[in-house]
Amino acid sequence: DPEMSRGLGDVYKRQGHGWLINQFLSPMFNKRTDEYGGDLTNRMRFALEIIENVRQKCGPDFILGYRLSADERVTGGLTIEDTKAIVPYLDQAGVDYFSISIAVNATDDQMIPSMYYRHGYQADYAKEVKDVTCKPVITVGRINDTRIAESILRSHKADLIGFARQSLTDPETPNKAREGRFEDIRKCVGCLHGCVGHIDTGLAGSCELNPLVGHESDPEYQTVPAEHPKKVMVVGAGPAGMQAAIAAAECGHQVE
C-alpha cells in the first residue's frame, strides 16, 4: 500500500477538528439517513472501516495513531461522553494510540489556544479518554514548559505530551530539559502571529521568537564566526533586541 511502499512505519490519522472522519462521527455534521448516519453505531461505521482497512493492509506491527476532538465545544456536537463511548471501538479496531484535542472550526479559539488560555488546559479531556482505553494517550494545548508537561504525566492525565508550536519556538526543548537547562528554553508565548496567522493568510509559517523557522537551511540565516570579534551593545530588550544579542554572541562578539 502507499504508506508501506514508502518505507513508513506508522501513520497518524488527524481526524478531529471537523475533518472528514470527524464529520461522520459528529451529530452536528452528519445528517445522513443511510447506514453511515443516525445513531452512534452508524456514525462510527466510516471510521471503523478505515481503521480496519489500514490495519488489514499494513499488518499488526504498523503503528496507527488517531487524533480526536474529545469535545467539539459547540451546541449539538460531540461531547466528552460521546468520545468515551467511541474510543473503545476505535481501540478494538486497531488504533495504537490516541491524540486528544478539542473543538472544531466554529470554536477554533479553543482548538489553537492563544496566550489567554491556561497551560495544559486540555489535559483533563485526555484523562477522561485514558479511563476507557489502555492505549497511550497524548495531550496537547498550550504546553510550553517541560515542568508543566512532567506534572501532567505524573498526575496520570496523559501518557505523552504533544509540543507543536513550542517545537517551532525552540526545537531543542526536550534536550535542554534533559540537561536541566530549563531557563534556557525559549517558550512559545501563544501570539498565533507567525505560525497560524501567516499560514491562514497564505504566507509561509514562521515564529515571532525564532527567526530560523522556515530558514533552517538558508545560508543567510546561519551563524558565521566573526573574523574580528567586537564589543556590541544592544539597546532594547524586545524579541528583536534579544535575538540580535543572541546572534552577536554566537558569532563571537562580546555583547553588553
At which residue positions do the language-model features occur?
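Single conserved hydrophobic/aromatic residue that forms the stacking wall/gate
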Residues: D1-Y12
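Structural preference for beta-strand elements that scaffold enzyme active sites
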Residues: D10, I63-R67, D96-S99, P136-I138, ...
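Glycine-rich tight-turn/loop motif centered on a GG-T
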Residues: I21-F46, T75-E81, D108-G120
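Glycine/Thr-rich beta-alpha phosphate-binding loop at enzyme active sites
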Residues: I86-K127, D131, K135, A247
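Glycine-rich phosphate-binding active-site loops on the catalytic face of alpha/beta enzymes
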Residues: K157-K176
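Cysteine-cluster motifs in flexible loop/terminal segments that predominantly coordinate metals
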Residues: P171, A177-P229
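N-terminal Rossmann-like FAD-binding beta1-loop-alpha1 element of flavoenzymes
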Residues: V232-E256
